Regions:
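A short glycine-rich, His/Asp/Glu-containing loop-to-beta-strand
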Residues: 1-18, 73
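Short histidine-centered beta-strand/loop micro-motifs
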Residues: 8-9, 17-22, 63, 83
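Short, conserved beta-strand element in jelly-roll/cupin
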Residues: 10-11, 22-37
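Structural motif
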Residues: 27, 34-36, 43, 59, ...
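A cytosolic small-molecule/anion-sensing beta-strand core signal
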Residues: 31-32, 47-48, 66
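Ligand-binding loop in jelly-roll beta-barrel domains
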Residues: 56-80
Length: 84
């Protein structure tokens, strides 16, 4: 499939996602644990089953409040995450 990238992360409690942005729209679903995500200055805690959407070119950051499992979908695809 083309047009998007699917990524799976196992994140340890206390891990920090530094503030950044990218040209890709991003949807993130927490499947286990609690993750604090700040999108464009607005902070929310996400738990299992909850989904956050980060618009393209929007500054965001985060922190794992517990050990977490997170699935991300990026569109357009991120070639730097390719297995090719």
């Amino acid at each position: 499939m083309e047009g998007f990238t699917l990524a799976y992360w196992e994140v340890k409690e206390g891990a920090i996602l530094p503030e950044h942005s990218h040209e890709n729209e991003q949807s993130s679903q927490v499947t286990e644990g609690k993750f604090e995500l700040t999108i464009d200055g607005h902070t929310q805690v996400y738990g299992p089953g909850e989904i956050a959407t980060v618009p393209a070119n929007t500054v965001h950051s985060g922190k794992a409040l517990t050990d977490c499992k997170i699935t991300d979908v990026f569109s357009p695809a991120r070639p730097e995450y390719s297995n090719d």
